[in-house]
């Protein structure tokens, strides 16, 4: 009877052990679906893009430097309100706020990712964030900004007007007339007295 009891308990124990292992493995796979980073380094890795001018619905190629210690790159794009924007194409794993690209070649030096800007939503600037996930170190964050190209009218509106650019107006009196001024000068009493004195002196000298 004891032998039969042991024969029943042994398979049951193995089944329970296997169930616990499968449950743990399933939990690990679920928790690692999306990367979240509480700690990371912020270092400039010279991220490049096919264009630094932001345009709605455009597709950009983003190049991130990697090495043999990097096994994944997590890409994220934020608008001016820190909301997720656009779509990362052909990613190995897409999440709500980021997308993951795995480095499948240990000799790879640059990882290329494609990002599509959203439809027009009054967005004038976005920040591309790249987290390089390393095997035995904290992830490294590098950023790159794309800005909308300013139009000529918008650029002119930003230039302050100084006094050098203000129009110059010459103010002249409207009621001044030279002829009237001459008549006033020659018709004054002093002028008449001078004329009389000159006439008297002239007549005295002649006679």
UniProtKB/Swiss-Prot annotation:
Any coiled-coil regions, as ranges: none
Q: Where is the lipid attached (GPI-anchor amidated serine)?
A: 187
Propeptide spans which residues? 188-207
How is this chain modified after translation? N-glycosylated. GPI-anchored.
GO CC, sorted alphabetically, is: apical plasma membrane; external side of plasma membrane; extracellular region; plasma membrane
Q: Report the domain of life of the source organism.
A: Eukaryota
- Principal localization? membrane
Localization, per the record, is: Apical cell membrane
Per UniProt, the keywords (alphabetical) are:
Cell membrane, Differentiation, Glycoprotein, GPI-anchor, Lipoprotein, Membrane, Signal
Q: How does it sit in the membrane?
A: Lipid-anchor; GPI-anchor
- Biological processes per GO annotation: cell differentiation; negative regulation of cell-matrix adhesion; positive regulation of cell migration; wound healing, spreading of epidermal cells
Give glycosylation sites per the record. 67, 122
Where does the secretion signal sit in this chain? 1-25
Matching PANTHER family, A to Z? Answer: PLACENTA-EXPRESSED TRANSCRIPT 1 PROTEIN (PTHR22527:SF2)
Q: What does this protein do?
A: Modulates leading keratinocyte migration and cellular adhesion to matrix proteins during a wound-healing response and promotes wound repair. May play a role during trichilemmal differentiation of the hair follicle.
Q: What is this protein called?
A: Placenta-expressed transcript 1 protein
